[in-house]
């Protein structure tokens, strides 16, 4: 009986134990909140910001020898020259790092950032927009214009008129070649530091130009258009004309011929005209060959008609 009662008691205890609910598991501890590090917001059009950023990039590049600078409101990049090898460094999304670039060194003029007034890029953008008519995705670039002169320029996307600035931040003037001042400035720009040319001239719808020998079989042209600084182009043409001193060409003499044509009713602000100055007559003294509308005139360097 005792054994039977004990067995019954053990069975009962086992059944009760099997029916008992296990204690609930402990509540999990809350996970710590992860906070992203904010990316520094820098507006490079604010006064002083662009210059500070370019200097920061130069410090990373470890050389001040620049061949290109690019600046927008949100990012900046520089291309430097190291032993005829280019490196590009950029600041984007709060990070400064070396980046891939298709910029190569083809004897561009090397410059330093302190030669350029980028203390207020926003002001340059405002001036450029007043001329181009667009604020869209403005970008400032500092680079050799191809004629050895380094200018600042502001372009937009979609593309509008590119606006150029001198290194000190003053605006490159737009030239009107139907005025004496436009003629004077255009000639001054294309002559630059040259003392001789094989040909020199102006075209009302193109600009001022100067030709000089490149190699024995090429001629180089310097061109200043109404809105773009001097550029150069080398063409396969053997220079056959005799060089002459460009100091002999006076802008007022060119204007005198145009003024005379105006008085005779052959020249207005919309009249297309051109003049080429060279020694094609083989006299040893260059002459000025004008085409004004449909009229042709040949003069000496003082503007007096010949023949």
Residue ranges and their predicted role:
Residues 1-11:
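N-terminal export and membrane-targeting signals
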Residues 14-18:
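C-terminal motif of bacterial Sec signal peptides marking the signal peptidase cleavage site
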Residues 19-23:
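Bacterial signal peptide processing site
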Residues 26-102, 175-209:
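Extracytoplasmic low-complexity, Pro/Thr/Ser/Ala/Gly-rich segments
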Residues 59-84, 142-161, 191-216, 273-298:
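Exposed beta-strand-loop-beta-strand "reactive/processing" segments of non-cytosolic proteins
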Residues 68-72, 77-81, 86-177:
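Long, acidic/polar, low-complexity amphipathic helices and coiled-coil-like
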Residues 100-136, 230-270:
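Long, charged/polar, surface-exposed segments that mediate recognition or autoinhibition
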Residues 155-195, 232-239, 260, 264-307:
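Extracellularly exposed regions in secreted/surface proteins, prominently low-complexity, repeat-rich
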């Amino acid at each position: 009986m005792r054994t039977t009662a004990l067995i019954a008691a053990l069975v009962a205890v086992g059944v009760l134990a099997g029916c008992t609910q296990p204690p609930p598991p402990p509540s999990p501890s809350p996970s710590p909140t992860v906070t992203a590090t904010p990316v520094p917001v820098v507006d490079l059009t604010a006064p002083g910001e662009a210059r500070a950023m370019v200097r920061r990039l130069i410090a990373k590049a470890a050389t001040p020898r620049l061949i290109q600078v690019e600046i927008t409101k949100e990012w900046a990049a520089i291309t430097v020259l190291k032993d005829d090898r280019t490196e590009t460094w950029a600041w984007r999304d709060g990070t400064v790092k070396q980046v891939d670039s298709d910029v190569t060194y083809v004897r561009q003029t090397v410059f330093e950032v302190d030669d350029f007034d980028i203390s207020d890029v926003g002001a340059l953008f405002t001036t450029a927009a007043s001329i181009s008519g667009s604020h869209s995705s403005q970008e400032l670039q500092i680079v050799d214009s191809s004629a050895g002169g380094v200018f600042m320029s502001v372009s937009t996307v979609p593309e509008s008129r590119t606006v150029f600035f001198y290194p000190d931040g003053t605006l490159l003037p737009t030239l009107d070649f139907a005025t004496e001042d436009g003629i004077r400035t255009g000639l001054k720009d294309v002559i630059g530091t040259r003392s001789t040319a094989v040909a020199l001239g102006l075209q009302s719808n193109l600009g001022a130009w100067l030709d000089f020998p490149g190699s024995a079989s090429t001629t180089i042209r310097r061109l200043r258009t109404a809105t773009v600084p001097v550029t150069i182009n080398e063409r396969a043409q053997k220079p056959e004309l005799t060089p002459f001193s460009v100091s002999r060409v006076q802008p007022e003499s060119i204007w005198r011929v145009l003024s005379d044509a105006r008085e005779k009713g052959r020249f207005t602000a919309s009249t297309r005209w051109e003049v080429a100055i060279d020694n094609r007559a083989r006299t040893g003294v260059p002459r000025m060959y004008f085409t004004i509308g449909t009229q042709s005139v040949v003069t000496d360097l003082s503007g007096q008609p010949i023949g």
